[in-house]
Amino acid sequence: MSKKALGIFTAALLGSMAASTAFAQTAVTQGKVTFDGELTTSTCSIKAGDEDKKVILPKISTVDLAKRGDTAGSTSFDITATNCAADVNKVAAHFEMTNMDPDTGNLKNLLEGDTAAKNVVVQLVNSDGAGIRAGSTGRYYDVTGTGTERGAMMLYGGQYYATGQTTAGKVNTFARFTLAYQ
């Protein structure tokens, strides 16, 4: 190999090594998450009795929940906001991340052992059937009325959601919620 060819080869090799080193040095391995929010003194109250809802999902067959992503047993519930401040125009339930299955964003079955159903979680849904990931806010509803009657009835639901082939058993979970405003 001539000295000129060897020089070109060496320069190309060193250049590619420098480029790969530069590329490795620019890889991003850290970042930040910025949180913005707002607190308000303008609020609504949760109607007495709605602060601790119990939803009974129907007893259904595991055949209806045979594979991941299958849903069944949708059951509606409502939460009523009352006594809303005059400047509150929309209200919704924000469902906290309590009991969240990190794989699906749905609510884990808290039961364990032989009596617990397996490969099933409970999915929160808006009134149109669209899923609500735990840690998210459901659909906002318009606030209407005056005085203590100023409020909104918010309609949501829960349904079984298969994470795989389900097995027979009991399901129990819960979602904490907080009123959110627009």
Segments predicted by a language model, with ranges:
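Bacterial N-terminal signal peptides
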Residues: T10-M17
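Mature extracellular/passenger domains of Gram-negative fimbrial/pilin and adhesin proteins
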Residues: S2-G7, S20-Q182
